[in-house]
Amino acid sequence: MSYHPGHGHRQEPRKGAGARRGFARPDDSADAPRTGPLIFEERSTENAGAAPPIEEQLKVHNNPYASLNIQQQRIRLPIFKNRGHILYMCERYRTIIIVGETGCGKSTQVPQFLLEAGWAADGRQIVITQPRRVAVVTLATRVAEEKDCILGHDVGYTVRFDDVSDKDTKVKFMTDGLLLREILADPLLSKYSIIMIDEAHERSCNTDILLGLLRKIIQIRNDLRIIVSSATLDAELFKDFFEMNETGNSDKDTAGIISVEGRTHPVAVHHTKTSVPDYCQSAVDTVINIHKHENPGDILVFLTGQDEVEDVCEKLRELAGNLKNCDRLWVVPCYGALPAREQMKAFDSTPHGTRKVVVATNIAEASITIPGICYVIDTGYVKLRAQHAANGVETLMRVTVSKASAEQRAGRAGRIRPGKCYRLYPESEFERFAEGTVPEIQRCQMASTILQLKALGVQNVHRFHYLSPPPSWAMINGLELLYALGAIDETSQLTSPLGLQMAEFPLPPMHSKCLLKSAEFGCSTEMVTIVAMMQIQDVFITPYRQRHQADVIRKKFAVEEGDHMTMLNVFTKFVENGRSKKWCSDHFVNYRGLMRADNVRSQLVRLLKRFEIEKVSSRGLINCSENIRQCLVTGFFSQAAQYHYTGKYMTVKESFPFNMYKGSSIMFKKDYPKWVIFTEVMQDSIRDVTVIEPEWLYELAPHYYEFGTEGELAEKRMRGPAATSAAADDDY
């Protein structure tokens, strides 16, 4: 891969391996849990100073702000004393960069400062963007509570497939991707007086593109103010990007920086002496040891994804039921795919005599602040998407976090009192981590971004003003894919109607192509269900003590044509059984995920109606499965693979080897199919796989592949350059 997130590599730990781990007490005041053999060594974070004596830490057991009413809590936030300065800077500068640690109050208070100062007068709105939907929902809910108003009126939010706002909304939270889409209809974002780009340091692809567009907009709209909010010290990068003053006279600067002190306490950081063989099990053991031996205070555990979070939560709940002479252990999951009501549980006050354990992905690293956290367990891993330079395939990879992310995680333990962070990796490994995470725009598939830019009127995407330019090979791969999909023509202009319609879907281009072509294959009803199901992470759940039962049930849903037909089967049965939560539980199906897919499906149906795509079903037809699978090929022909005698699948383009994902329904087949397409890649495995016939590639993508034997292809190349954008060297 072209993307290397760390300096050096950690040995990949096994999940589900290794014995239970205990802790040995170090010879220092800020001790780790007390049973061994897993040994922790203490290191204090550089910005925290030395931890105070343990007797001082014992004086505070609960959140000192919990007894205050909401307005008193607002006043106590660190950012409140900067209120006047922030409002002055909004008058003085066109762009304001606010640097403040997570938890200082910038995300919830700055919008209220602006509202109170009249920036939402005359029908204008204040909009705040976030990279993640969970942050959008939680922040909007909190601000509405602080303003004592109904969520959706004065304060509202908009995320993909869910709009909780009305025409009178004054403060609106939304994902950065949705604000990008608004520019399609309103290029100058004229209804907004102030646009606040929050969590800009996360450098999502949408955020980077949005910053580039806003830089153009403020040159036209003198009345618009841009606020860029960041939790890390990269303020100069943003200031230089937005600064329009070229005279050298600072009095004419158009961008200014304000730093906000955080409300942090010292955090004692403990590293393991050696690498752990199974970080999920080690995280479970560490939680139990903290709960048995440490003072009151909630725990935050960082894992990489929904499957790990649910697995660890289940183990903790089982162990918690057997604990004696301990306070109650309340286990709460937190990840992006959770419904809003479930996500909000992480923010609920912890009852007396209870310790809350929040098991989260990296959404809890910076986007949201969970109250009451005193202990952090950092596994040192995160899942990121990265594109392979040669074959253009985007992979969801588990990689080590950066040093900046590790410090962010540790800092979550020091919000209300001196805290502790337990890192499940040695300090020597930490020193090999990269300083920061590579911006998403420099490691991901660019087709969606290019499609959006084209729709926004940016014709020369290479010369767009990027905060960090993407690599040229990524731009070329993205343009080639869009051309192959029929979204752009030979001059790189959007095609009509296909390219224009694809740009309006809040989906990756390959997904939207399948939807827009589905009526031609007589399966639009089925395809809208499959595409909706592709937007959720996991269709099935596998409790760690019921794996055999889950596999037996799962096998009943599996069909030999592959995962997408299996998804269709599951959703159909879900609807036939009244969308029952009990039915899902009995069949090890992800109820939360299917409810989300149901909502997404409704939104996609409305879009198809707007584009006058005929509603037609293949159900009951002899060639039903074939129609659906051929329709999938129209979008995912570039991700075709052939079975190799080594047991791997080789991509047709560039002959790149992949394993079959162990959770695929293909694994239930006696023999592996010879040809497949895949719509997702995790690490080195293809998942969400559908069986195809090789002739379909010839029929549906003759413009993308060359066909013939090795000798025929060699002779064709000797005669002249290939007229296609990609060539396959495999025999066909």
Curated annotation (Swiss-Prot):
InterPro entries: DEAD-box_helicase_OB_fold (IPR011709), DEAD/DEAH_box_helicase_dom (IPR011545), DNA/RNA_helicase_DEAH_CS (IPR002464), HA2_WH (IPR048333), Helicase-assoc_dom (IPR007502), Helicase_ATP-bd (IPR014001), Helicase_C-like (IPR001650), P-loop_NTPase (IPR027417). A motif (DEAH box) lies at residues 198-201. It is an enzyme of class 3 (hydrolase). Residues 283-457 form the Helicase C-terminal domain. PANTHER family: ATP-DEPENDENT RNA HELICASE (PTHR18934), ATP-DEPENDENT RNA HELICASE DHX35-RELATED (PTHR18934:SF136). Belongs to the DEAD box helicase family. DEAH subfamily. This is Probable ATP-dependent RNA helicase DHX35 homolog.
